[in-house]
Regions:
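Short hydrophobic-aromatic micro-motifs
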Residues: 37-41, 103, 144-157, 303
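An internal, short helix-loop-strand segment that often contains or flanks glycine-aspartate motifs
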Residues: 46-82, 125-239, 254-255, 268, ...
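Hydrophobic membrane-insertion alpha-helices, especially the h-region
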Residues: 2-17
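Beta-strand-dominated lipid-handling architectures at cellular/organellar boundaries
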Residues: 115-117, 241-243, 257, 270-271
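C-terminal soluble interaction/assembly domains
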Residues: 253-308, 314, 320-323, 346-348
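One face of beta-strands
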Residues: 37-39, 103-105, 229-231, 239-247, ...
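Long, low-complexity, Ser/Thr/Gly/Pro-rich intrinsically disordered segments that act as flexible linkers
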Residues: 19-126, 130, 143
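Short, low-complexity cationic-aromatic patches
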Residues: 29-32, 90-99, 138-150, 235-239, ...
Length: 351
């Protein structure tokens, strides 16, 4: 009898663990440290929808070209998933706050070749729990990198080495479904199923709008966010690429004001003729911006849009989209008078 009870308990525990894990955030996200914002990108479906990684780029930065030559790893082709933890800095003695990042990258790479390359760049290699941590100087900071498995790497430019050590500790416990940053544990259930790009972020009160790239909000809209609000943004493919941004505020009044402000921006955007690379109006870009809508749901503002696949492909494969009035024909500039003409004019006046 006790054997039967033990089997039932063990089976129940396994089923519970499987169910919890199936509802947990992706593995890459669960390895991240505590942070102010989390950003996740799944590149595998993006490659199916676009030409990303299918054609070698015409030009590469020489430093990146050398990285590819020595490691055999191309981000466009070989990176499958990426998770980023964003750590907002604090201004000290008049110096502006510096945002730091920790990341988990999953893909296909040769551990031996990548390890040899990192060792050449590192000023120090620390051994921690059977893993090498490479300390690499980059722009007056130290970037620490660790190869966690045959398809997973961790990196962080946070000052404390404890951050990447904690990521290694999390990797050791990756089978458990309860790990991950508090933001993810609390709000990941709000991310729509099948999202290929999503972020959960608390906007920094000290950062400028242009420094809030992790919020996935267009243009300067992130500058309108109420203090201490929270943003959940996501994109997932159906007939089009669906975008959704939930801005969670502290009150219905805050949500109403933000909704009205964004609504004003939407009216302005929809009144413009959208052009791509100065080539005239683009129907896919226009369709994307025409689909933008915002509404209030109690203490939240909800922004939605549907992006045509054609526009999605343009974003990843063509020059940047220019948002603004369509280019107008310019009148030719008047030609300057020649010295001979000036002398003739002077003589006629003298007569």
């Amino acid at each position: 009898m006790w054997v039967a009870v033990a089997i039932v308990v063990i089976a129940g525990g396994i089923v519970t663990a499987v169910l919890l894990r199936s509802r947990a955030a992706p593995d890459a996200v669960r390895l991240l440290p505590e942070s102010d914002a989390v950003l996740y990108v799944n590149l595998e479906p993006i490659r199916l929808l676009t030409d990303l990684g299918k054609k070698p780029p015409k030009e590469r930065d020489p430093q990146y070209e050398e990285f590819v030559r020595q490691t055999g790893f191309e981000f466009e082709r070989d990176l499958d998933k990426a998770a980023f933890a964003i750590h907002y800095g604090v201004a000290v003695k008049g110096k502006p706050a510096e945002t730091r990042y920790s990341e988990i990258l999953q893909g296909h790479f040769d551990s031996a070749r990548v390890g040899d390359y990192l060792r050449k760049l590192a000023t120090q290699v620390e051994r921690y729990r059977d893993y090498d941590i490479y300390d690499i100087p980059v722009e007056e900071r130290t970037v620490r990198v660790a190869l966690l498995g045959f398809d997973t790497a961790a990196a962080s430019n946070v000052d404390s080495p404890e951050v990447i050590r904690g990521m290694i500790d999390s990797y050791k416990q990756a089978a458990l479904p309860f790990t991950g940053p508090a933001l993810v544990s609390q709000y990941y259930r709000r991310v729509p199923l099948g999202s290929i790009v999503w972020t959960i972020a608390r906007p920094s009160a000290n950062s400028a709008a242009q420094d809030r790239g992790e919020l996935l909000l267009p243009g300067s809209w992130s500058g309108l966010l109420p203090r201490a609000s929270l943003v959940i943004a996501s994109a997932w493919p159906l007939n089009d690429v669906h975008l959704r941004v939930n801005v969670i505020t502290h009150s219905a009044d805050e949500a109403r004001r933000f909704t009205e402000q964004v609504g004003t921006y939407l009216m302005l955007f929809k009144s413009l003729e959208i052009s791509v690379d100065a080539g005239g109006p683009d129907k896919d870009v226009k369709a994307a911006f025409d689909s933008l809508e915002v509404h209030q749901d109690k203490s939240e503002a909800v922004l939605t849009a549907k992006v045509p696949y054609a526009f999605f492909k343009k974003v990843l494969s063509e020059p940047p989209v220019e948002l603004g009035p369509a280019p107008q024909k310019q009148e030719p500039a008047p030609q300057p008078e020649t010295p001979t003409a000036k002398r003739k004019t002077s003589k006629s006046k003298a007569k």
